Amino acid sequence: MEDIVARFETYAELCRAVQRKAIELENHPERKKRLRRFAAAEVAEILGISPGYLRSLVHEPDFPSGAIGPGGRRSFALSEIHAARAWLFAHTGNPRYAPRRRPEAGEKLQVVTFVNFKGGSGKTTTAVHFAQYLALRGYRVLLVDLDPQASATALFGLDPESEVRDATFASWLDRSRDARALVRPTHWDGLDLVPASIALQHAEYDLVGRLLERRDFPFYAQLAELLAELEAAYDVVVCDCRPDVGMLTLNALWAATGLVVPVPPSMLDFASSGEFFRFLAEVARDFRGSIARDALAFDFVRIVTTRFKASDRNQAEIVRWKRALFRDAVLAEAMVDTALVDAAGILKETLYEYEPAGNRRTYERGLEAVRRVDRALERELLRVWGRPVEA
């Protein structure tokens, strides 16, 4: 009889090998993830200035000049974009060039939790794109991967088995690691990661065991305590949850200031989301009755339509129903279902990282759809901080 344990271990290693090879091929010869450079037109859009103004600024003292590539095209690293934004603020005083939160003005750390009952909702894709968008915009971002499948972690080029192991949120539960020791820098300047691995599955059991041993154990507040140790270093924390309602998800809900629920436009997902919101109501009722009267008092809750095909009339009808029922809780913008996301995913990349070999116009349309969703979510942060919100 074949050893089923050995078979599954072999399958797991084959999957990891494919991930490693994809990263190595795309990033040869470094064999680790690196971020592409950004064209001058992209940089102008990111900074909110005209391309002509950017061309004039590169000749100013201390302004990042970027690098000249084939055809005389100028490009910039993300760190140079951050430096350009700082230069603009120093020379204009315009607060739009100083996006970091201002604790002295009462701007608290925003913890945005992406969560849903159901796998396949596009949750991780939406969460990681949002985290990268915020980094492009100049915020200090921490992405916390709470899913033992570690899909978000893999997108940043880490092998959960060999490079992460137990250095996850799970290690915080017994305080065997300092909070800062769990944070990994990524190839995105301004974006750090608390990675995931299968060790998080054991964290679920650990939290249940501690609660059985001590009924007053604050099992729900462990992530909030971790983030309290790291708060001064970040403006926004993005949490990618596992697709269930276990102990880790409860921690992410307790720590959250904002909630994003990705929902594909299908009746099955619509029904599943109804059960999810019923669960949230029960959790809020229990927490408020036994722990704190203001538990789960989110600054915002938004439903994001994911995997949307505008040409599909059935999907369009479901989206209309959602907006009629949930009104402003549903973002007007949607994460479109595009083959480009799959193409980028093969290389363990997002659309912000991807450099298409084919139709550039198709890529730009897909990227702009993602940007619209991310801008809409950024506006929620600005509202909470009491800042002006651009349309």
Where are these regions (language model features)?
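P-loop NTP-binding core
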Residues: 1-42, 46, 51-52, 56-391
